[in-house]
Amino acid sequence: LAKRKAGGEEEDGEWRPPATQKRQKAGSEAESADCYRSPFRKPLTQLTNRPLCLDSSQHEAFIRSILSKPFKVPIPNYKGPTGLRALGIKRAGLRSPLHDPFEEGALVLYEPPLLSAHEQLKIDKDKVPVHVVVDPVLSRVLRPHQREGVKFLWDCVTSRRIPGSHGCIMADEMGLGKTLQCITLMWTLLRQSPDCKPEIEKAMVVSPSSLVRNWYNEVEKWLGGRIQPLAIDGGSKEEIDRKLVGSMNQRGLRVPSPILIISYETFRLHAEALQKGSVGLVICDEGHRLKNSENQTYQALNSLNTPRRVLISGTPIQNDLLEYFSLVHFVNSGILGTAQEFKRHFELPILKGRDADASEAERQKGEERLKELISIVNRCLIRRTSDILSKYLPVKIEQVVCCRLTPLQAELYKNFLKQAKPVEELKEGKINVSSLSSITSLKKLCNHPALIYDKCVEEEEGFMGALDLFPAGYSTKSVEPQLSGKMLVLDYILAVTKSTSNDKVVLVSNYTQTLDLFEKLCRNRRYLYVRLDGTMSIKKRAKVVERFNSPSSPEFIFMLSSKAGGCGLNLIGANRLVMFDPDWNPANDEQAMARVWRDGQKKTCYIYRLLSTGTIEEKIFQRQTHKKALSSCVVDEEQDVERHFSLGELKELFSLNETTISDTHDKIKCRRCVNGHQVRPPPEGSDCTSDLSQWNHCADKRGLQDSVLKAAWDAAVTFTFHHHSHEEQRGIP
């Protein structure tokens, strides 16, 4: 060990601080100056450029000397200014796209023209267009038809399909992923363009109120945390106005919530606030709501300041030519001219050519104008059918089940036909639209006599003395399935399904009163159920659907009011669906039936469409399936019946055929059946989208594929049409 000197220096001359005296406790002896120090402690080294003792002025001077040293750029020979924000040298070169267009599986929406080496030298580097490539996060999950759809949408809204027009109609059938395609379009437009900057700053989705939360969830699902949508699904008028004004005032590249999701009703009520700003793109879900250009919603949306419009409609565009015009005019104003020009150039010649008394020249002119119209519309409309789904989804078996009326229903039905005024008026050749509300009474009677019991008690028109027909002691407090043919069949279907499988069932009806009966039946049978109708809040709907779809959920039945937003709901937790009553508009029934057979479904799906044999329900169903010419249109409400039915057809509505096993089968004059029994199978290649005459026809249960319906046959089934979506599952789900 080095010997230490008294002054704090060692023999080798190294400096160390002198020893300091520690404060001693009172009463203790002071230590000597030469106190013991550990020989292992390393001595401190003095800073050569720092004074030994610093006063405040010296300290300040020392800090200033450090800060005043010039900043040295860590790049050799760099002579540029150091005060700019840019770090390092800006490298000259062409701009690059956001995602690699040459990566395997890349979905390229725009490919810039190739530049020669000479052109690359001459062109302004900041003006060279770049590839527009869909984010790989989305392109990896898009199916082939969806990739094609996204390309079509992008071409339309960027005016590449129709110069000067920026709109299109996405009319794919239900279940083909229209929502995902539109989310992909929005995300691409919000992030990139050929000009190497976002094409739009903001997008807006307008949908039925029941789908606002669904859209929000879908954006979250596919984009994760990459974007924060704003969904307006509740709150006071002032609160909603404040949110909307704030959203419309947002501008720039970094808008906090670039996607606004709002319902048609809220949009209409707050149109003034929304029209103060501009939006890069508006998407209208369930766009067939805009088929009437006179209604307030159409006009409010049409006045929104937006160049790009996409209209989604899974429902086939109805056969009314004016609906064609309204929808196309909304997305691409002017491509079909004004309403008057459209009527003169297209509608009148086409309708005249369709007339039974048209001359050959008129017929030919009508066909030419129709082809011209279709060629224009097809430039901004894309439609694919659900046939594509057969590659990805399990088999769907669709069944139209005719159920005989019970004796009570038959007596009440005949009693009504004898008394009701519409029947008398029709015999005299008169049509009173207001009296046609009695159609609703007949439809409810077909569901269950309990639904018209109050009318019988009050002896309303058509139900005089009908109370005597009910069994003694009858009460509406308890459901009695044996009093309704359809309810009896439903009771069997539910019981057999519950006892033989772990399948779940969706029950759909047009009437909330019928849902009340379903509830009573479920309570009697101790089935767990959930119910969605117009009284349920939007937020609660989303939670109920999510819970029902969970495999661990104990609910067996999901009750759905078709009027309360059946469209857009994803109910893949169930694989059996019962349409308890038909709707005048086939689109409504199609919407409801598409709830279970859609992306994510793993089980074979069974659809049951129940009809009361020989009644008004079969007439409504025939109306749905009958292929009409362009001049006819679909009945939306019962008040419109007079406009769509001839006197003879109306007379037929008010009739009951008690001897038939299926009035619908009688009407199609089937050549494959002998004495009601099918002797030849359906044509090869036919499926459940084919005409009803090409389905399987069963007058007994021998030809049925569904074991559940076989077990329920003897309850009250008289006849069944059935067919499948495809032979077997193809491809991978």
From Swiss-Prot:
One Gene Ontology molecular-function label: ATP-dependent DNA/DNA annealing activity
GO-annotated biological processes: double-strand break repair via synthesis-dependent strand annealing; reciprocal meiotic recombination
Enzyme Commission number, as recorded: 3.6.4.-
Tissues/organs with expression: Highly expressed in bursa, thymus, testis, and ovary. Low level of expression seen in all other organs tested.
N6-acetyllysine modified-residue sites: 504
InterPro entries per UniProt: Helicase_ATP-bd (IPR014001), Helicase_C-like (IPR001650), P-loop_NTPase (IPR027417), SNF2-like_sf (IPR038718), SNF2/RAD54-like_C (IPR049730), SNF2_N (IPR000330), SNF2_RAD54_helicase_repair (IPR050496)
SUPFAM superfamilies reported in the protein's UniProt record: P-loop containing nucleoside triphosphate hydrolases
Pfam families with a match to the protein in the record: Helicase_C, SNF2-rel_dom
Binding annotation for ATP: 172-179
UniProt keyword annotation of Repeat present: no
Keywords recorded for this protein, A-Z: Acetylation, ATP-binding, DNA damage, DNA repair, DNA-binding, Helicase, Hydrolase, Metal-binding, Nucleotide-binding, Nucleus, Phosphoprotein, Zinc
CDD domains: DEXHc_RAD54A, SF2_C_SNF
GO CC annotations, alphabetized: nucleus
Region of interest (Disordered), residue spans: 1-35
Motif DEGH box, chain ranges: 285-288
UniProt keyword RNA-binding, yes or no: no
Principal subcellular localisation of the protein: nucleus
EC supergroup of this enzyme: hydrolase
Post-translational modification (record): Acetylated. Acetylation promotes interaction with BRD9, and subsequently with RAD54, which is essential for homologous recombination (HR).
Subcellular compartments: Nucleus
Function: Plays an essential role in homologous recombination (HR) which is a major pathway for repairing DNA double-strand breaks (DSBs), single-stranded DNA (ssDNA) gaps, and stalled or collapsed replication forks. Acts as a molecular motor during the homology search and guides RAD51 ssDNA along a donor dsDNA thereby changing the homology search from the diffusion-based mechanism to a motor-guided mechanism. Plays also an essential role in RAD51-mediated synaptic complex formation which consists of three strands encased in a protein filament formed once homology is recognized.
Protein family per UniProt: Belongs to the SNF2/RAD54 helicase family.
Name of this chain's protein: DNA repair and recombination protein RAD54-like
Organism: Gallus gallus
